[in-house]
Structures are given as C-alpha cells and as structure tokens.
From Swiss-Prot:
The lineage of its organism: Bacteria, Pseudomonadati, Pseudomonadota, Gammaproteobacteria, Enterobacterales. Pathway: Cofactor biosynthesis; molybdopterin biosynthesis. The active site is at D128. Keywords: Lyase, Molybdenum cofactor biosynthesis. It comes from Yersinia pseudotuberculosis serotype IB (strain PB1/+). Substrate binds at L75, C76, H77, M113, E114. One of its GO terms (biological process) is Mo-molybdopterin cofactor biosynthetic process. Belongs to the MoaC family. One of its GO terms (molecular function) is cyclic pyranopterin monophosphate synthase activity. It catalyses: (8S)-3',8-cyclo-7,8-dihydroguanosine 5'-triphosphate = cyclic pyranopterin phosphate + diphosphate. It comes from the Bacteria. This is Cyclic pyranopterin monophosphate synthase. Homohexamer; trimer of dimers.
Length: 159
C-alpha cells in the first residue's frame, strides 16, 4: 500500500516538499451532482430564478474556489493554475445538475484538489442560490474523474 504523503514518520501532518520534483503538465477533472425537484431545475433552465443566472454564478464560484484551494485545504500548495474550466449541465431526465471541472498547470504538484474544490463549491453555490425554493437538494457524489502528469502516473475512474 502507498504511504500517506502528508504524514511524516512521527505521525505529524506536514506539507510535502516538492522542490526536487520535475515540472510537468498536470491536469485533473472532477465532477459533482446536485439533485433537486423538477420545478427547481426548471427555474434554473428557464432563467426565472429570482437570484439571477444560477449557472453563471456557480461557474465563477468554482473558478474562484480552484484558485483559493491552498487557502481552504491546509496542506495544499499555492499553485499557478493555467486553466480552470467549470461546465454545468442540466439533466432534466435525472432532475439534477452535473458539474464537470478541469484544472491544469505546468508545475511540481498535481491539481486534483483544485478540480475537486471547484466542483464542490460550484455545487454549493447552486444550493445556496436555490435554497429559498428547495431546501432538500442533495449534493453528491463528488469525485475525481481523471488526473495526468506527475510521477504517480495517470488515473481515470471506471465509469
């Protein structure tokens, strides 16, 4: 089994030293879902929600969250992201919104946490904007879809 990288030999949490790593292009994709009633989703789709464009707000929130991941997750490195993309898709057949994020950089550490944070915060923003009309929305699952670059190799979730 692989060792936990954020725990040192004394069992203490620490930030991983990446100074000796090579810079490579690294990319990660993540997804999240927000399940809701058909009427709530219809308000988002037709733009009749009183708070405005839910998707535009969630997209910007996800992008901002990716850029601030290092401030939210204690042992994450501050990263110079070169791409953050947040796609939102209404799925009326499932009464939900699907969020897919992509983060990329050329650097010494991966961007999985940035992609996951972007997806999570976009989902939370949808909840926040729609909670006045529906409080029992469900967020999840949130998961990593792919990662590439770095010495640990590539990852792709089995769908």
């Amino acid at each position: 089994m692989t060792q936990l990288t954020h725990i040192n030999t004394a069992g203490e949490a620490h930030m991983v030293d990446v100074s000796a790593k090579n810079e490579t292009v690294r990319e990660a994709r993540a997804e999240a879902f927000v399940d809701m009633q058909a009427a709530t989703l219809a308000m988002i789709i037709d733009g009749s929600h009183h708070k405005g464009d839910v998707f535009a707000t969630a997209r910007i929130a996800g992008i901002q969250a990716a850029k601030k991941t290092w401030e939210l997750i204690p042992l994450c490195h501050p990263l110079l992201l070169t791409k953050v993309e947040v796609k939102l898709e209404a799925q009326p057949e499932h009464n939900r919104v699907r969020i897919e994020t992509c983060c990329r950089l050329t650097g010494k550490t991966g961007v999985e946490m940035e992609a996951l944070t972007a997806a999570s915060v976009a989902a939370l923003t949808i909840y926040d904007m729609c909670k006045a009309v529906q409080k029992d929305m469900v967020i999840g699952p949130v998961r990593l879809l792919t990662k590439s670059g770095g010495k640990s190799g590539d990852f792709k979730v089995d769908i």
